[in-house]
From Swiss-Prot:
Spans traversing the lipid bilayer: none
Protein name as it appears in the record: Indole-3-glycerol phosphate synthase
One protein family per Pfam: IGPS
Keywords: Amino-acid biosynthesis, Aromatic amino acid biosynthesis, Decarboxylase, Lyase, Tryptophan biosynthesis
UniProt catalytic activity: 1-(2-carboxyphenylamino)-1-deoxy-D-ribulose 5-phosphate + H(+) = (1S,2R)-1-C-(indol-3-yl)glycerol 3-phosphate + CO2 + H2O
SUPFAM superfamilies attached to this UniProt entry: Ribulose-phoshate binding barrel
UniProt record similarity statement: Belongs to the TrpC family.
Single GO molecular function: indole-3-glycerol-phosphate synthase activity
Source organism of the structure: Staphylococcus haemolyticus (strain JCSC1435)
E.C. number(s) listed in UniProt: 4.1.1.48
An example Gene Ontology biological process: L-tryptophan biosynthetic process
NCBIfam families reported for this sequence: PRK00278.1-3
Amino acid sequence: MTILSEIVDYKEQLLKDGYYHDKLQNLKGVKHKNKSRLTDALIKNDNLTLIAEIKSKSPSVKAFQQTNIIKQVSDYERYGANAISVLTDERYFGGSFERLQQISETTQLPVLCKDFIIDPLQIDVAQKAGASIILLIVNILTDEKLRQLYQYASSKGLEVLVEVHDGIELQRAYQLNPQIIGVNNRDLKSFNTDVKHTNQILKCKKENYLYISESGIHSQQEVKQIVKSGIDGLLVGGALMNCNELEHFIPSLKLKKVKQ
């Protein structure tokens, strides 16, 4: 069993146990007034759009540098991040919907609920906790379920980041005609990363979509390796969580876009 399939089994069990129903009942809810949209930033910015991530741990990293989460988000915003990504999985990533709610209340930036969504109820909880964007991972969903969840989230006014890991998944994503497609540089079996994965997958990309490179980005040099693939943005997590010089590091990642 891969780590990913283990996580999905865990989500299915949480659904059966009423975890998400309880969250929906108990979260106080966050209003979305004046939130900017990720799509607008991706389209309008001449430089790469940055989604800066908050997480405490991952299956490949036992713990990231301890920090005041609200200050971290404030620093992300101050130094040029365009959106915030929040891991809400508790067991594997040390996140929570309460953290998502807290962050959503303190920033005007769009907020991505980064989780392993397999049911509409999870989308309801994410939105109530303040998310304006949700993640759908093509690898863990059938075409029918992917379309159902995409349409459901869109009908609720949420933006959707559709994540792919290979060329076959990219073609499946195109069937939705989504605005935003994320290319994850992480190998789902080993959880190792290689940023050149973005270049390989986007060799066969279609125009008129917005592309984000996700995971494994630790330096400007790595961004230089992938910017020519035609990406519009980056999602960076671990490197930001462990960084003590965000005022320099964040601007260094936001290179000028290269459109083909």
